Amino acid sequence: MEGKTGVLVKNTTSDVWTWDNPPEGFYKATAATCTQVLTFAVGQEQPVGFVATCMSVDPDGDVSVSLLTPHPDGALITQTSGTGKWEAYTGVEWIGGTDIQIDANTSTYSWKATD
C-alpha cells in the first residue's frame, strides 16, 4: 500500500519461537504464524516502525495471540489472549528478536521475560 510519503508492507510468516527459561510445563519452543505490517518512509530501506499479530498453538493444543511492537532491544511481545497454560499469561510481556532469518517468510526468534 503506497502513500505520498511512505509505504506499508504486509507480510505473513511462519516462525519458531524459543523461550528463555520457560515456566515448568511449558515447551522450550513453539510455532507461530504472524501477520506483520511494516512502515517505510519513501526512499528508505529500513522500516520506521512495525506491528505484528501472532498466533501460536503449542504441542498440547493450548493457544495464544500476541502483539509485537518495536523495542530498543528488538521487539516487545505482549500476550493479548490465551487458553490452557497460556491463559494466566494474558497481559505478560517479553523482549526478544530474530535469531535466524531462514527465508523471507520464516525465522527463529527467542524471547525473555521483561522482569
Protein language model regions, located:
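Beta-strand-enriched cores of mature, soluble protein domains
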Residues: 1-115
